[in-house]
């Protein structure tokens, strides 16, 4: 995702959260008037993984999360609200979900912002437990990403939304006083968020490709069936025309 000037780690495809020494938080956005950028692909040989985190950085993540967790709801709410401003698509999705939820009091609607905030907190609880198991770690994140692929068709949810989420989360979390207390915690959270966003996007895009492939295959099969039905109808018509031309005996 990013290349960190303050860290030796290089991340995956997304490069939307490049860290520099400019600005109070060491974070510069590139590509637009505010410095935001779209992602660019990098080769897998340059990718950072969760295994690149040192033991002390993993400790720093867990310790800082315990301190941050009581304030997590407020932090994540700010992130999602900023994402709504940055992406009208997200605002529309949350609005529709809240509207549906107003008429459905049986179960929590997982698409609302409030439930997203709760689930994000729970997600980080589970994620930090799996820091030593990269397969489980990646699968958890990609599963979340793939679950959002269904929004691509009806709500125009796109990969650039993950990019923007990464930019906002990087700025909000990494500038939090709990995280900025130690250099190890700051570097670790930047690494974690960069990999997190990349895997979310990877899961989303992978599932989206499967949807498109399935849809394309279904269209081909449907086309074949329609062609066969049309051919059958034409053959029936030919038989009827032929029978009508036969002389009566």
UniProtKB/Swiss-Prot annotation:
Keyword tags: Heme, Iron, Metal-binding, Oxygen transport, Transport
Keyword Ubl conjugation set for record: no
GO biological process entries: oxygen transport; response to hypoxia
PROSITE patterns listed in its UniProt record: GLOBIN
Record-annotated Globin domain positions: 52-205
Domain of life of the source: Eukaryota
One Gene Ontology molecular-function label: oxygen binding
Annotated binding of heme, by residue: 116, 148
Chain segments carrying region Disordered: 20-43
Database matches in InterPro entries: Globin, Globin-like_OT, Globin-like_sf, Globin/Proto, Mb-like_M
Family from the record: Belongs to the globin family.
Name of the protein: Globin-like protein 9
Source species: Caenorhabditis elegans
Gene designation: glb-9
